[in-house]
Amino acid sequence: MNRALIIIDFINEFLHPDGKITPQGMGKFCEEYGVIWNAKKLIDFFRKNNEEIIWIHLGFHENYDNCSNLSPRFKWAPSMWILRENTWSVEFVKELGYKSEEKTITKTRVSPFYKTELEAYLLEKWITEIVVAGVATDLAVSSITR
């Protein structure tokens, strides 16, 4: 049995005090309930056991041509000039100790499967069990576990 830890959306824009979305409550909730600390424990455990870790985060092109204006979750991103690829906004929070040599997938929708290589990667690595840690249980975490 091959197992993978999937880390979803632990990004600055959602969790860092300087994030434009953080005031909506995710950052405070995660701090209050130790979400980042618990995710870090999982990451350390998987690394210690040489198990697969997959990092998933949002990331839109600089011109937002891959950001759907039909998406109720992200259609406002261009007006706030956030969640662009290769910016501080979508970097993983430093507390988790992200390593670029671990598999990283950029998504443009809530679902980490939508137009990404996630499914193909899981099949390629013969992953039969996943452990998921994310900051939006009702959104991205739910969509990957359904």
What name fits each language-model region?
Residues 1-99:
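Active-site acidic carboxylates
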Residues 64, 114-115, 140:
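Short secondary-structure boundary/hinge segments and terminal tails
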Residues 85-134:
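Internal catalytic-core helix/loop-beta-alpha segment
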Residues 137-144:
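Short glycine/serine/threonine-rich phosphate/pyrophosphate-binding segments
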